[in-house]
């Protein structure tokens, strides 16, 4: 199956708050094939289904906070199954959770078992701290994927954060090939103070062409565009990023756009 291009909706959260349906229509018009949710903005499961059907967008999955999975896993599983979403993704771990990896790993196994039983797939989405912090003598990210079986946890690799952490995203794609359905495609510049500023695809320092090539070669189902913060209008940002994606595809990038 050819790799498709989706959008992590966190990118356009300001617009979703004001006009959820209109924003999803715009995302579809721009050429994104699927969306990864980060909240549903008070919409019912029926309302989400309706706008997905209208726009033809695929529900790729949902970034679902770790604590929400602890408290309301069954509810989240039911919602995702109903809208046709396949992936439940742990998006982020708060600072206070980053010193209790054995417990987190056991929780991921539990979540993964329940997802699997319902025909869904649990993924983990990294930032930079999973590469800079260690557990059992290796980067946390590697420890998680080593200690939670592949059958219970798949990889959503945020290649931009891997690069920002000083690791090699191409090596990580190669390492987790076959376990890597989702790849976040993101660009950034490192500011003078060393902090990251996310920018539109092609405007930053990340090797996004090589990452796209590697993700496609590794059999990723989705390359998911994400921009954590947009300096201008977020809808303009996702338009600019899609223009870069189309140019990439026109130059031979093997993508369905």
Task: Label every model-predicted segment.
Residues 1-29, 53, 81-84, 135-137, ...:
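Histidine-acidic metal/acid-base catalytic patches
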Residues 6, 36, 61, 89, ...:
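Conserved beta-strand positions in the central sheet of alpha/beta enzyme cores
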Residues 8-12, 38-40, 64-67, 92-95, ...:
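Active-site beta-loop-alpha junctions enriched in small/polar residues
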Residues 24, 49, 77, 112, ...:
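Short glycine-/small-residue-rich flexible loop motifs, especially phosphate/cofactor-binding loops
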Residues 34, 66-154, 162-164, 235:
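Active-site acidic/histidine proton-transfer and metal-coordination neighborhood
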Residues 36-39, 44-45, 58, 67, ...:
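Domain-start "cap" segments at the beginnings of catalytic or binding domains
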Residues 40-51, 99-101, 107:
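Active-site-adjacent beta->alpha loops and helix N-cap segments on the catalytic face
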Residues 44-63, 111, 118-120, 241-243:
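Short acidic, glycine/proline-enriched helix-loop-strand junctions
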């Amino acid at each position: 199956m050819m790799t498709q291009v989706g959008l992590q909706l966190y990118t356009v959260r300001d617009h979703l708050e004001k006009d959820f349906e209109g924003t999803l229509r715009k995302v579809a018009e721009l050429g994104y094939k699927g969306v990864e949710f980060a909240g549903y903005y008070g919409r019912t499961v029926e309302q989400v289904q309706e706008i997905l059907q209208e726009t033809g967008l695929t529900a790729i999955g949902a970034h679902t906070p770790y604590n929400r999975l602890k408290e309301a896993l069954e509810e989240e599983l039911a919602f995702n199954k109903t809208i046709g979403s396949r992936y439940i993704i742990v998006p982020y771990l708060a600072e206070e959770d980053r010193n209790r990896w054995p417990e987190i790993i056991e929780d991921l196994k539990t979540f993964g078992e329940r997802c699997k039983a319902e025909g869904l797939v649990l993924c983990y989405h990294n930032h930079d701290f999973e590469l800079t912090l260690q557990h059992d003598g290796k980067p946390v990210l590697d420890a998680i994927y080593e200690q939670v079986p592949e059958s219970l946890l798949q990889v959503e690799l945020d290649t931009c954060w891997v690069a920002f952490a000083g690791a090699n995203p191409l090596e990580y794609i190669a390492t987790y090939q076959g376990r890597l359905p989702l790849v976040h495609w993101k660009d950034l510049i490192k500011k003078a103070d060393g902090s990251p500023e996310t920018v539109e695809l092609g405007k930053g320092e990340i090797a996004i062409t090589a990452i796209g090539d590697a993700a496609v070669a590794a059999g990723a189902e989705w390359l998911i565009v994400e921009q954590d913060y947009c300096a201008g209008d977020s809808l303009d940002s996702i338009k600019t990023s899609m223009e870069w994606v189309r140019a990439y595809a026109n130059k031979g990038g093997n993508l369905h756009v």
